[in-house]
Amino acid sequence: MPTLRRLDISEFRNLRSATLQPGEGINLISGENGSGKTSILESISVLAHGRSFRTHKFRRLINNDEKSFTLFGQIFEGTTRNIGLSRASNGDIQIRIDSKAAHTATELAECLPLLVMNSASFQLLEGSGQVRRKFFDWLVFHVKQEFKHYWKLYARCIKQRNSLLRRDKITRSELLPWDQELTKAAQHIESMRSEVFELFQTHFLNEIGQFDFTETLGAELSCTYVSGWSKTGNYNEQLEDQFERDVAAGYTHIGSHKSDVKINLARVPAVEELSRGQQKSVIVALFLAEALVFRTTTGRTPVFLLDDLPAELDEKNLRIVGKALKNLGSQVFATAIDPKSILTGWELVDDESLRMFHVKHGQVELKNDITLRDSFLL
């Protein structure tokens, strides 16, 4: 399994200079609000994805007194790989993998598959289909090598088609060549998504069944993949039927860019019926299902970044999550203001493989002496 064995952070937010040597299992990061513990998770995300899970404005990632930040990671997966990323305030970005220049963040993502769960993850239930589609496509991207090719082709066709739709007096015949290419790409995308979703759905239902609250619900919790067009007909023919509507709006209404993963209780969106704690359990089950399908199909396990996991989870459900992560075998980075709930709930007090880090005013300190853990339990 891929694990991050070393992390060097320079001028990233309030972390002026920090070096971490994480363990291959649980890495627990504690600290007060604003101390910088979430920034550690964020730096790993930027290093692995090329982007932050907190902001789209990269200048906010650079320490106020500096003109750039630099991140370096050492990944072990049978052999050691070195990855690095630097970003300057003028927008310049440098990515290096094993001392060679890389051109896209996709190459980083392939080195270190990463799942990030934080407060924004509630958008998987509260947000639009785009949020869930992006979440699910992470899995399809990693387990189906051809997906990237067909998605890029599809995106190019949609962009060109929408551009033509906004032109004066566009005819159906002018769109036809693009529609044919769009249809081919969409069929491949839907085929791959459907195949992966069968596995995902099975694992999700198994994982959510571990939480007791599902037995008290008045209806069955379901997870369904919904295509972006009607499955009763040909996509190309449906594009033709939508022509006048698309011209009037200036964009394409149906297609793989409109697909969704629905989480319902009976026929009602689950978010409208479940408590905040129950929603958190559903979100955990979604992430665990992704990780399990990823492991089943690739033989690898993703790295988990869990920001303030204990929030909204009671002791029993937190224990269920800890057991599932242990069985999965993933490397985990988890933050908590008070690590007591994780230490006790996950039975980590005497675990010699645990790495504990404490962050204060941007300074990171290793708290790995097993005798020190009792101080967090007082």
UniProtKB/Swiss-Prot annotation:
InterPro entries: DNA-binding_RecF, P-loop_NTPase, RecF/RecN/SMC_N, RecF_2. ATP binds at G31, E32, N33, G34, S35, G36, K37, T38. It is found in: Cytoplasm. One of its GO terms (cellular component) is cytoplasm. SUPFAM superfamilies: P-loop containing nucleoside triphosphate hydrolases. Its main location: cytoplasm. Keywords: ATP-binding, Cytoplasm, DNA damage, DNA repair, DNA replication, DNA-binding, Nucleotide-binding, SOS response. One of its GO terms (biological process) is double-strand break repair. NCBIfam families: recf. Belongs to the RecF family. The RecF protein is involved in DNA metabolism; it is required for DNA replication and normal SOS inducibility. RecF binds preferentially to single-stranded, linear DNA. It also seems to bind ATP. This is DNA replication and repair protein RecF. It comes from Teredinibacter turnerae (strain ATCC 39867 / T7901). The gene is recF.
